[in-house]
Amino acid sequence: MHAAGRTLTSAFPRPRAPVWLVVPWAMATSAPVAAEQVTLPDVVVSASRNEQRRFDAPAAIDSIPVDPFTATSPLVSLSELTLTSPGIAVRDRQNYSQDLQIAVRGFGSRSTFGVRGVRLFVDGIPATMPDGQGQASTFDLANASRIEVLRGPFAQMYGNASGGVVQVFTPDPPKTGFTGRASTGFGSDGQWQAGVSLAGGNDRLGGTLDAWTYQTDGYRDHSAAKRYQLNAKIVAQPSTATKITGQFNYFNQPLAEDPLGLTRAQADANPRQAIAAATQFNTGKDVEQTQAGVVVEHQLTDLDSLNFRLYGGGRQLTQRLGFSGAAPSSAGGIVDLDRTYGGGALSWTRKTTANGLPLQWTAGLEVNGMRDARHGYVNDNGQQGALRRDETDEAADYGAYAQFNWTVHPAWEIVGGLRASMVRLRIDDHYVTAASPDDSGTSTYRNLSPVLGVVWHAMETLNVYANLGRGFETPTLTEVAYGPNGVGANLGLQASTSRQGEIGVKWESDGQRIDAALFDADSHSEIVPLSNNNGRTVYQNVDGVRRRGLELGWHGAFGPARRLAAGLAYTYLDAYFGDAFVNAQGATVAAGNRLPGTARHSFGAELTYKPWGQWMVGVEAKADSKVYADDLNTQAAPGYFIFNLKTGYTFKAGATQWYVFGRIDNVADRHYIGSVIVNEANGRYYEPAPGRRFFVGLRASM
């Protein structure tokens, strides 16, 4: 696939002057093109927590359509669906042990595992834990109907770690009859996917059930993975005023090998390789998660409605790290975690009038909690050795909020909100020795997050909006685990706070959509590594982190029957440290250094054409500029440009609708870095992306 020794090249020259020359403003970006459909979903709920047109939403928000039947990809990763959504960066690490990297306007870019800085939901149920750590791997994209991406100040209404909000929505069962869908597909590197989905119901009761599996040998050595998912949804409507939705989700990943990162020289020489430590310590993880929840929507009167949710679940994880962790002061090289979590929320919405014009407000209460039984063991060449860590970790998140949308004039709308949050983290250390002192302790964080904005409905086809807000992000349990000088927990670590502003415009007319925005976020007490010793990473706060930029999105459908569709997204992100600080190696990080894990320029485009109704052909393009891998800006992944080809054909045989599809990714077989591990302690920052690869599949629906 790749010639040894090929050099990574940059797709973007370094800009001679900053693009940022104007005051901060922001955007609600265009929804990306759905390759197999020309209509875009027009309803969103993330901005106001109630249904409204995306065009009218007073915030930067995308609604990404998902059609599991006519998608031309296996629907394993969120990165398959966000190509033409500006402002969000989703990097598939080709490492199912470490999950995706998701960043919204630069928030979340520094996470080395899981998702931080971005709040995740599925059908209104949180997929982010109370300490701010989330997992996107459990998303059931093969049964999704749309994905909403909310950016900017209004994301702060969701509380801790809300640099952005990503919500996945699944379809309700049909009101009449029965439907079924089956799919299978295979591709390069041993990829294989299969699934089945059933749905049926009537006006009062219905349900959906889908089961799905995916496995791969992995692009790199020691990167094989297997996943199984089972999801059920029951919708009951005992009256016209009440809707009850029950959900059950099961996720099992018994195999997820971790090839670990590479140095730049290793990535250039052989991007498929895994370092020796990966096989020596059998790095990877297995995880099993079960969750159930219920959402009740009740219309009290014509003006008032209630929404109630309750959920709970468990997660069991065993992870083998790339070192032994045998030192007496180490936390071990094998992590064994048994988690229980749950929560509930209640909100009240009232739609009324003021001076004869619409006024809507929503008030709510939320509580979420988690409890981890966490153990660490010596990694004895892939086998569990002696105990090195024994803790009970707890996190609780409490929130109260109120939001309003007030039309003060037929052309003007004022929007705002206020959220009070409290997050409490507790560590109870049961493994205390002379070399491993007591890490027990409690940290409590409180924050008040206001948001205020205005929308000008300039014309039927043009909206202009501006928002200001303030938010916060607490440390995770992992980040407060170890204190400076090897003594106790890091209870002095503060929550990061941010002030955000945006101004944006939305235009829609005759099958086309343009969205443009400028944004600015100024953060204080940002959380960065202070030291790393024997697997114990200590974190510190730094001030003056700035994220500002421009988002542009366009979508259009043209010609008879809208057979030609196109979309593109561009993001300019200027993210940097405003103040100097000392890093984990004792070196001074200069003021003005770029925030690692962020690309200054990102571009995505898609063009699809249907020569006739049953056949679709399309091309995709993606480019990122250079991404620094460390705070010192001494290591960087060069920019890249790739393009993909895809096609799909629909036909009918009897009562069954069939869809056959195929795609070739990275057609030019470019060698590039798909993601970086920010501030990796051993200098192995780079995770290469696959070269040219294919995937073909067949689906049936009845």
Model-identified regions with their sequence ranges:
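Conserved C-terminal beta-signal and adjacent last beta-strands/turns
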Residues: V22, H222, V235-P238, N249, ...
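N-terminal periplasmic accessory domains that precede
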Residues: L78-L81, Q101-R105, V118-F121, Q135-S137, ...
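Short acidic/polar hinge/loop motifs at secondary-structure boundaries
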Residues: S109, G117-V118, I125-R151
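Membrane-embedded beta-barrel scaffold of Gram-negative outer-membrane proteins
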Residues: E297, S305-L321, H457, N463-G469, ...
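Structural signature of Gram-negative outer-membrane beta-barrels, strongest in the C-terminal barrel
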Residues: F248, A354-N368, E391-D522
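Face-selective signature of the C-terminal outer-membrane beta-barrel domain
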Residues: A241-F251, D286-V432, I514-D515, R563-G567, ...
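Gram-negative outer-membrane beta-barrel transporters
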Residues: W348-T349, I414, M422-V423, R513, ...
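Transmembrane beta-barrel wall of Gram-negative outer-membrane proteins
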Residues: T179, F186-Q215, R220-D258, G284-Q299, ...
